[in-house]
Every structure is written in structure tokens, then in C-alpha cells.
Amino acid sequence: MPQTIAEKIISNHSGRRVKAGEFVIADVDLTAVQDGTGPLTVEELKKAGFTKLANPARTILFIDHAAPSPRKELSNSQVVLRNFAKETGAILSEIGEGVCHQLLAEKYVNPGEILIGADSHTCTGGALGAFATGMGSTDVAVGMALGKTWLKAPQTFKIEVEGAFKKGVGAKDLILHLIGVIGADGATYKALEFHGSTIRNMEMADRFTLANMAVEAGAKAGLFFTDEKTRAYLAERGRGDNFKLISADEGADYEKVIKIDASSLEPTVSCPHTVDNTKTVGELKDIKVNQVFIGTCTNGRIEDLRIAAEILKDKKVNPGTRTFITPASRDVMLAALKEGLIEIFVKAGASVQTPGCGPCVGVHGGILGDGEVCLATQNRNFQGRMGNTKGFIYLSSPAVAAYSALKGYISDPREILK
């Protein structure tokens, strides 16, 4: 029987042919936690009596959410991870290295693998043809200790995207539009499998954006076939030998097929307080923006920063719109320095922050004041997400965010991108 990508990868890790809906115990290739979820994982491991990890070299502890830490309680949680790494041989990713999902892609995830992480956006790794999914701290603790996990093979939605984007429109607009169509819980425990000419022509940075936000429709995973672009991405990072072809079988069974014409899309924004509350930029009038944030595991890659720099070059951000730019990793920061992007941002009046999650999680780096509006390239706009339940968060592409920083209100970047 033909299989989806999810069914294939899970079958290869469970010793038998698996179809959607079946429960399996599957081998895990890679596990990850971050400084918000990791301390609980460590606590659960110790409570269960585990003293060794199944694969320390493939167990990664990231300090990225409160990096640098703004208060002692968070600093103490980070000490827990540092000590655990010393005790077990797990890999520690320190403050300034970057966001866990970006670093997993840059350094660790390979096609055909199963990655479980104690963070919702672990699904980012699906862009590399891996079954990457977020789980709770306790589930990840078991995976770290035993090298196995228990899960149900998900049904799959096939997302077919054809056509070319208009100028000023891209992957972020596509995924926001898709979530608006599906709904915030419309794909709960499904895999989203991306297909079509638009996806084939898409660079890896944009595939990561799509995979990253699959969970915002409730999805278990966001999955991609592998191709020469995947191979090149891995080879550039010293993992070319780990490339393998991953694809769904012809005739695989999909619960639903959703077709999108990329050429019909407009710059799209998610409005407070849910990601599926989407509107085109043209539908939003006179929405003043107090803060713009460009970065995160969704849109903090070098390609995203290039877009922002193109718009901000030789200009000044609106004096009433503070602007934060946070590279997703140290490698992205170094590339941005080499290309002169950081100078462009600083001269434009933006603040460039330490690689990491930045203001996204609302513990430091840009907490909103009462009634303030932030336009961010992150993946969530839940009430209180950026540290204040009285704040308002809109989500957009880097192009919309950068141009809005200049104008002081949510604006269409096509006015400047000719």
C-alpha cells in the first residue's frame, strides 16, 4: 500500500509497515529541550531513576529562550541544564548560539530521521524531510533515556501549491493564508505534507518557515520531500553524506487535499489574538505600530534579514516605532555582519539583539506596554505572548514588518519593492 512521508519514516523506525492511525513504539534519532522546558525534563529523568542517556551525542540542550537571562530564577534553571550536560555528556548549546530550531537545522537534523523536542516548533525540522515533532517534557525525557517514543502515526493533509509569488509576497504570507483557511485547530494531530511547483522552486529558508508554523494549525508535523536544494543545504554544513531521498509514494492516502494558487496571494497578517485571524495588508487601515520585531525560528534567517535590509537601507525607522532585529543563530549574525546588514540596521535606528528567541516568548528583550501594538515575524500572537496580556500582536513577513517600521503603521511593502 502506498505511503505518505509520515507513514514511511515512522515505519522505518518501528520495524514494521505502519499506516495512519496506528500506535507504535518508534526509535528516536535526536532529542532536544530548551531552557523553558528542559529543567522539567531533567527533573522527570531523575525522578524516574534514569542516570544515563540513550545517545548523549544526539541529545541537545539549548539555552535560547531567556538568553541572556533577565532574572535569577531563569538563570538557576539554566544552571540545571549546564550541570546535566556535564553529568550525562549531552550537548549544551549556550547563550548566543541561537534558537534551538535554527540550530537543529544547521547542525543536527537529517532526512528520514525522527526528532522529538520539548518545544512546539520542533516541527521546523520537517523541511529537511525528517519527522520532527514537539512533545511534552516527560515524553521527551523518556525518549532521551530509552531512545524510543510512543506515538500514533498521523493522517496527512496534502498541501498543493502552484504558481509564482508576486513581488513582496512569500512563504510567510502563504503559511498565514493556509492557517487562516484550515483554522487554528483544523489540522490537529495531522501531518501537513507540502507539494507543488511553488514548493519545488522554494529555497530552504522558506521551507523552514512553512514547516515551523504547521503546528499553528494544530499539526503534528510539517513535511517536505527532499531534493537537490536539501542536498546542497546539508553539504554546505558538512552533512552532505547524510542526504537521502524522501518522498511520498504515488497514490498515498490523504485525508484531505488543499490546493493554493501562490500567484493569487497578497501580503498577509495575523491579527490579535489568534494566528488564524488573518487579513490581507490591504484590509488593515491605520493600525499604528509601537514595536516591530524581525527574527525568531520562523523568520530570523539570513534570507529574511536580507529582505529587511533591502527595505531599511539608507532610511530611518519611524521615531514612534522601536525596531528589534534578532538573528536566529550565531552563523546568521556572522553572515549579516559580513554582508553589511547589521550596519544597515543600526544606521536605520533598529536595535540588533543577541541571537536567540528574543522578545517572542515575553520574558525579555521587548516586553510590550499596556495597549501597545507589536508587528512581529514570529509564529504566535496569543494574548500575553510577549509578556503583557494588555498588548496586541500582529504577525507578518519580514517585508511587511520592515516597511511598517519605516511607516509607523502596518503597510504594504509592494509600495517600495518595485
Swiss-Prot record:
Binds 1 [4Fe-4S] cluster per subunit. GO terms for molecular function: 3-isopropylmalate dehydratase activity; 4 iron, 4 sulfur cluster binding; metal ion binding. Keywords: 4Fe-4S, Amino-acid biosynthesis, Branched-chain amino acid biosynthesis, Iron, Iron-sulfur, Leucine biosynthesis, Lyase, Metal-binding. PANTHER family: HOMOACONITASE, MITOCHONDRIAL, HOMOACONITASE, MITOCHONDRIAL-RELATED. The lineage of its organism: Bacteria, Pseudomonadati, Elusimicrobiota, Elusimicrobia, Elusimicrobiales. Pathway: Amino-acid biosynthesis; L-leucine biosynthesis; L-leucine from 3-methyl-2-oxobutanoate: step 2/4. Its EC number is 4.2.1.33. Heterodimer of LeuC and LeuD. Gene3D superfamilies: Aconitase, domain 3. Catalyzes the isomerization between 2-isopropylmalate and 3-isopropylmalate, via the formation of 2-isopropylmaleate. Its cofactor is [4Fe-4S] cluster. [4Fe-4S] cluster binds at C297, C357, C360. It catalyses: (2R,3S)-3-isopropylmalate = (2S)-2-isopropylmalate. One of its GO terms (biological process) is L-leucine biosynthetic process. InterPro entries: Acnase/IPM_dHydase_lsu_aba_1/3, Acoase/IPM_deHydtase_lsu_aba, Aconitase_4Fe-4S_BS, Aconitase_4Fe-4S_dom, HAcnase/IPMdehydase_lsu_prok, Homoacnase/IPMdehydase_lsu, IPM_dehydratase_rel_enz, IPMI_cat. This is 3-isopropylmalate dehydratase large subunit. It is an enzyme of class 4 (lyase). Pfam families: Aconitase (PF00330). NCBIfam families: hacA_fam (TIGR01343), IPMI_arch (TIGR02086), PRK00402.1 (NF001614). Belongs to the aconitase/IPM isomerase family. LeuC type 2 subfamily.
